[in-house]
Amino acid sequence: MGLSDQEWQQVLTIWGKVEADIAGHGHEVLMRLFHDHPETLDRFDKFKGLKTPDQMKGSEDLKKHGATVLTQLGKILKQKGNHESELKPLAQTHATKHKIPVKYLEFISEVIIKVIAEKHAADFGADSQAAMKKALELFRNDMASKYKEFGFQG
């Protein structure tokens, strides 16, 4: 299930474009996640008051959290699958503190791909999308394994 060197290159090339506006991309990802999967909002006490797209769009806290999410994901992606040291603390907080189900990681993965495809259509063709899907699946599978180590079936 590992990625080839070429696939990692595709993932990291497009991720460079994401990092050029990490806050904008992160904000869009979370807004889309909460719109497409409203049940995910229940896991974020500080965002429960954001009921409308305009409220979400105007929320600096949501924008900041979106940047945090994608920054952490970027650190993991840059490890090209050798991400144990970055993944373990993230999995621990998501399993024991936030209790984020693996299904929600699937949801956000889908949204990340949609947002990148919309913002960077010319640079994110079928091959790059397939590579990103594979990288995010590797991330999710490894998170799920860590969840089990922490006693969370997520």
From Swiss-Prot:
Reaction catalyzed: Fe(III)-heme b-[protein] + nitric oxide + H2O = Fe(II)-heme b-[protein] + nitrite + 2 H(+); H2O2 + AH2 = A + 2 H2O
Pfam families, sorted: Globin (PF00042)
EC number: 1.7.-.-, 1.11.1.-
Localization: Cytoplasm, Sarcoplasm
A GO molecular function held by the record: peroxidase activity
SUPFAM superfamilies, alphabetized: Globin-like (SSF46458)
InterPro entries tied to this protein: Globin (IPR000971), Globin-like_sf (IPR009050), Myoglobin (IPR002335)
A Gene Ontology cellular-component term: sarcoplasm
Residue positions binding nitrite: 65
Keyword list, A-Z: Cytoplasm, Heme, Iron, Metal-binding, Muscle protein, Oxidoreductase, Oxygen transport, Transport
Superkingdom classification of source: Eukaryota
Residues the record lists as binding O2: 65
The protein's enzyme class: oxidoreductase
Coiled coil: none
Residues of the Globin domain: 2-148
Any one of the GO BP annotations: removal of superoxide radicals
Annotated family: Belongs to the globin family.
Subunit structure, interactors included: Monomeric.
Chain's role: Monomeric heme protein which primary function is to store oxygen and facilitate its diffusion within muscle tissues. Reversibly binds oxygen through a pentacoordinated heme iron and enables its timely and efficient release as needed during periods of heightened demand. Depending on the oxidative conditions of tissues and cells, and in addition to its ability to bind oxygen, it also has a nitrite reductase activity whereby it regulates the production of bioactive nitric oxide.
Name listed for the protein in its UniProt record: Myoglobin
Organism: Gallus gallus
Taxonomic path: Eukaryota, Metazoa, Chordata, Craniata, Vertebrata
